[in-house]
Structures are given as C-alpha cells and as structure tokens.
Amino acid sequence: MIDDDGYRPNVGIVICNRQGQVLWARRYGQNSWQFPQGGINAGETAEQAMYRELFEEVGLGRKDVKILASTRNWLRYKLPKRLVRWDTKPVCIGQKQRWFLLQLQCSEAEINMQRSNTPEFDGWRWVSYWYPVRQVVSFKRDVYRRVMKEFSSVVMSLQESVAQGGRSAPGYRRKRG
C-alpha cells in the first residue's frame, strides 16, 4: 500500500525498559541495527499494525508491553535512490511512519526474534536512550532524532520514577546499591 506521494504507511516501535534503555535490534544476517518497524496493511489501524509487527519481529504480545506514547504526526523519510525499486508500480520513494513508545511489562526472556518464518532480526540488546540516533543508517537519522525527542520526556519521567524507588516492571529486579 503506497500513498499518492509515493510513501508506504508504516509503524515504528521503540521498546524501553524501566531504566530508560531501548531495545536495539540487529537486522538478520547484517551488521545493521534499527528499531522494529513494518508496513500497515489495508484495513489495519496503526495500533493494530504495531501489535502485529511487535509479535512478528520481537515475539511479544499486547500483555507484554504498555503503550506509553505515540507520535502526534506522520514522520517521513526518503529512501536513497539506489534503494528505490523503480520497476515496481506504484513506486515507493520512502516511508511515512507512526511511532509507538512501549514499556516492557514482562521478563526480557520473553523477547524472541525467531517467531516469524522470515525473521527480520537475529539479535538485540539494550542501549542508552539516545544511542540509536547516532547509529542508525543515515537516511533514517532525522526521523529517529524527531521520534526520540518527542518521546524523551516520557522516558525521562520513567527513569525518575525508578530513581525515586518506583515499582519495577514484572520480571525485573531493582539493583540494590
């Protein structure tokens, strides 16, 4: 499904833990890392697509996460010309994305990148909140910067809650200092 401007509707997913770290996933068979993302199918809402992609790419369901925020607007990036498939119609020149910030509610042991017959990722790790902005492929950096800026106040308040002795998510134990 490509819109009239040549952009494919898509969802992006930022999963954070109680410490404010985010899940950073390695693309299958590559040394390329990114947040989970995927297309919105015809007749599907952005939220429905997010839950489908969450299960397909990360192996988590609704009960495993809590939606903390979503972007107010669509965010767009253009594909580099070398990645555009000019021989397909309609031509997709990029993606327009709605992003969701999720908090992990289950044990990280539940994360399973191999639930799909065609896995998108073959590994993951927790990274500091701003790390992805500097590390993602260059044509996605502006969108990542905008997403992380929009979600930052939510994640920072989460970190403050933990620092002040807030309850940890199920499956997590606070480290004692």
Swiss-Prot record:
GO terms for biological process: mRNA catabolic process. Its cofactor is a divalent metal cation. One of its GO terms (cellular component) is cytoplasm. It comes from the Bacteria. Residues 6-149 form the Nudix hydrolase domain. It is an enzyme of class 3 (hydrolase). InterPro entries: Nudix_hydrolase, NUDIX_hydrolase-like_dom_sf, NUDIX_hydrolase_CS, NUDIX_hydrolase_dom, RppH. One of its GO terms (molecular function) is mRNA 5'-diphosphatase activity. Keywords: Hydrolase, Metal-binding. A motif (Nudix box) lies at residues 38-59. The keyword Hydrolase applies. The keyword Hydrolase applies. Its EC number is 3.6.1.-. Disulfide bonds: none annotated. Belongs to the Nudix hydrolase family. RppH subfamily. Accelerates the degradation of transcripts by removing pyrophosphate from the 5'-end of triphosphorylated RNA, leading to a more labile monophosphorylated state that can stimulate subsequent ribonuclease cleavage. This is RNA pyrophosphohydrolase. It comes from Edwardsiella ictaluri (strain 93-146). The gene is rppH.
